[in-house]
Amino acid sequence: MNVNYLNDSDLDFLQHCSEEQLANFARLLTHNEKGKTRLSSVLMRNELFKSMEGHPEQHRRNWQLIAGELQHFGGDSIANKLRGHGKLYRAILLDVSKRLKLKADKEMSTFEIEQQLLEQFLRNTWKKMDEEHKQEFLHAVDARVNELEELLPLLMKDKLLAKGVSHLLSSQLTRILRTHAAMSVLGHGLLRGAGLGGPVGAALNGVKAVSGSSYRVTIPAVLQIACLRRMVSATQV
């Protein structure tokens, strides 16, 4: 099955990501929180991608297919079939921002909207952390301050925000944030009382907007794209 990638300047940077970064991002798209392949995944049924299973650069050589998978999840399935591809990343980002009630001005750059999203994610996650998790996070970003309001300016200035959010998304203690619970942490209130170290308080059965966007996939995916963009940018400076 083909994955049609729509040329997207906001996703072109993915070609500069490492194999590990792309493999982790692809898995976020293609597998659910139980480690099972999503039935709606197109990438996992793509013959070219499957033929490179075990190749050391399977994901790097197919970054456009991975980007196309994100575009696929960002668009309505029926609309995707009609136009032959999914949505551009910026449209997905604006959809996510609207869903999470973030004030994203269309005049803002993609980078600025992402920055706003990352900051809100970090603020809401911090509120749900116990002291042990806070200290683990501070250690992960090499921070010497203990309060979030002191930490945020440093993260912005030193380009460590992406490192911090990536730690939260990938760490075992917050694995629920990689899936549907990301919406709760961002403040949308779809889940109640789901602490970072505790069990998920409720399960989402494929939350979708009128447009058909699968937010249980696109919200954590957009967060990860924002992180990867900053990591790649930092290596190119």
From Swiss-Prot:
Matches recorded under InterPro entries: DUF3944 (IPR025217), Ubiq_cyt_c_chap (IPR021150)
Membrane-crossing segments per the record: none
Signal sequence interval, chain numbering: none
Family matches, as Pfam families: DUF3944, Ubiq_cyt_C_chap
Phenotype of null mutants: Strand-specific deletion mutant, which disrupts only yaaW, shows no difference in growth compared with wild-type strain at 37 degrees Celsius or after heat shock. Biofilm formation is increased at 37 degrees Celsius.
Protein family (similarity comment): Belongs to the UPF0174 family.
Protein name: UPF0174 protein YaaW
Protein species of origin: Escherichia coli O157:H7
